[in-house]
Amino acid sequence: VLSPSDKANVKATWDKIGGHAGEYGGEALERTFASFPTTKTYFPHFDLSPGSAQVKAHGKKVADALTNAVAHGDDLPMALSTLSDLHAYKLRVDPVNFKLLSHCLLVTLACHHPAEFTPAVHASLDKFFSTVSTVLTSKYR
C-alpha cells in the first residue's frame, strides 16, 4: 500500500519528468527488450531495432498509462481496469514482464534524474510500479 509520502514522492517525480514521460517510456521499453529478449515475443509485428518509431510509440502509451495512474493514485483498479482486461484477456502477457519493465523504468528514471533519485524516491517508485503491476495482473486470477 502506498503511503501518503510515497504518493507525494511519485507525484513530485512525475511532475519533474513532465514532457519527457513518453521519451522515457520508449527508452525503458528498449532497455527491457535488450535486457530481457523473451519480452520481444509479444511484439512480433514491431520493428524492435534501437530507435524504432513503433517502440517509441508504445513506450509513450506505457508512459501515458502511468501518468493516468499517478493522477488516480487513490483508485488504481478503476484507472487501470481497461488495460488490465486487455493484458489479461486479449494479449495474455506473462505477469513477470510487468516486473521486468518496472525495473527498466526505475533504471531509466535514475539515469535521467540521478540527483532526485534518492533512496526514498526509489522506494516509493518501486512500490508504485509494483502496485500498478499487481493491478494489471489482478484479472489473471
Swiss-Prot record:
What positions are modified (Phosphoserine)?
Answer: 3, 35, 49, 102, 124, 138
Per the record's keyword annotation, is Manganese included, yes or no? no
Q: Name one GO biological process term.
A: hydrogen peroxide catabolic process
Q: Phosphotyrosine (modified residue): where? A: 24
Q: Indicate which residues the UniProt annotation says bind heme b.
A: 87
Recorded hits in PROSITE patterns, A to Z, give: GLOBIN
| UniProt cross-references to Gene3D superfamilies, sorted A to Z | Globins (1.10.490.10)
The entry's keywords: Acetylation, Heme, Iron, Metal-binding, Oxygen transport, Phosphoprotein, Transport
Where are the N6-succinyllysine modifications?
A: 7, 11, 16, 40
N6-acetyllysine-modified residues are 16
**Tissue expression:** Red blood cells.
Q: Which residues bind O2?
A: 58
The organism's place on the tree of life at top rank: Eukaryota
List residues, modification Phosphothreonine: 108, 134, 137
Q: Which GO terms describe its cellular component?
A: blood microparticle; haptoglobin-hemoglobin complex; hemoglobin complex
Q: Does the keyword Acetylation apply?
A: yes
Q: How does it assemble?
A: Heterotetramer of two alpha chains and two beta chains.
Q: Tell me the function of this protein.
A: Involved in oxygen transport from the lung to the various peripheral tissues.
Q: Which family does it belong to?
A: Belongs to the globin family.
Report what the protein is called. Hemoglobin subunit alpha
